[in-house]
């Protein structure tokens, strides 16, 4: 083993026990190994957030890559008064919303025709053939249908549901990420959950009707 490999392993061993915030301080002080470790810790979570919000895996991967480009480029913008994950998800949420607007521009749908993307009542339906990539085709039917239903929830409420129920962020952290009042966060999450339940009910009613017809031989 070369000296550089030995040094690299020693550096990794030193960094592994550190918190996210401690790793950011190391990164700000010149440790690229700290950045690599942060990326390993959160790459999948960032892509998962973007996928759940956008409904398209390829776009989610692109967002994930850009998130860590921003983390690298703007590392000195991170202040140690907040959690690293709050800063990270703020970047992820903003880039995901930007990508959603790009999606509609690519599909020749103006924001004026589509309605206000920040409206609680406006749900943007991504085509169903985009909701699951080929490499994830082995996911359960339930997981697929939950994602379809999630994409029918209005973007503002969907963002909060993903942060709370899928990314396990606290209400206080979500308020920081979205710059919303705590009471607004809680009410929108409740509203979004109700929307999700309604869409799941609609999907499963159709699903069971199909199988009833098949069982009847029709």
PLM regions with names:
Residues 9-10, 14, 18, 118-148:
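Acidic, proline/glycine-rich intrinsically disordered inter-domain spacer in sigma factors
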Residues 48, 62-69, 82-94:
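Structural recognition of an alpha-helix C-terminal capping motif at a helix-to-coil junction
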Residues 76-80, 90-111, 191:
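Arg/Lys-rich amphipathic alpha helix in sigma70-family domain 2
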Residues 1-6, 108-112, 124, 145-148, ...:
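C-terminal edge and immediately downstream basic/flexible tail or linker adjoining helix-turn-helix-like DNA-binding
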Residues 28-37, 47-66, 182, 207-208:
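Short, charged helix-capping/linker segments at alpha-helix termini
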Residues 28-29, 56, 68-83, 102-103:
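Sigma70-family region 2
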Residues 18, 147-184:
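Helix-turn-helix DNA-binding module
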Residues 39-57, 74, 150, 202:
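Amphipathic, Lys/Arg- and hydrophobic-enriched alpha-helical face
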């Amino acid at each position: 083993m070369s000296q550089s490999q030995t040094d690299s392993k020693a550096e990794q061993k030193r960094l592994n026990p550190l918190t996210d915030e401690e790793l950011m301080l190391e990164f700000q002080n010149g440790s690229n190994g700290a950045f690599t470790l942060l990326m390993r810790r959160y790459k999948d979570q960032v892509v998962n957030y973007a996928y759940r919000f956008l409904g398209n895996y390829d776009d989610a991967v692109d967002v994930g890559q850009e998130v860590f480009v921003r983390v690298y480029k703007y590392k000195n913008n991170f202040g140690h008064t907040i959690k690293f994950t709050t800063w990270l998800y703020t970047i992820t949420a903003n880039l995901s919303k930007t990508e959603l607007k790009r999606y509609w521009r690519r599909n020749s749908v103006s924001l004026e025709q589509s309605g206000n993307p920040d409206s609680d009542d406006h749900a943007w339906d991504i085509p169903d053939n985009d909701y699951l990539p080929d490499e994830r085709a082995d996911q359960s039917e339930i997981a697929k249908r939950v994602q379809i239903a999630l994409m029918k929830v209005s973007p503002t409420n969907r963002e909060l549901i993903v942060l709370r129920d899928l990314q396990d962020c606290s209400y206080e952290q979500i308020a920081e990420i979205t710059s919303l009042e705590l009471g607004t966060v809680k009410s929108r999450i409740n509203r979004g959950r109700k929307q999700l339940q309604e869409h799941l009910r609609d999907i499963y009613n159709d699903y069971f009707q199909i199988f009833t017809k098949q069982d009847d031989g029709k």
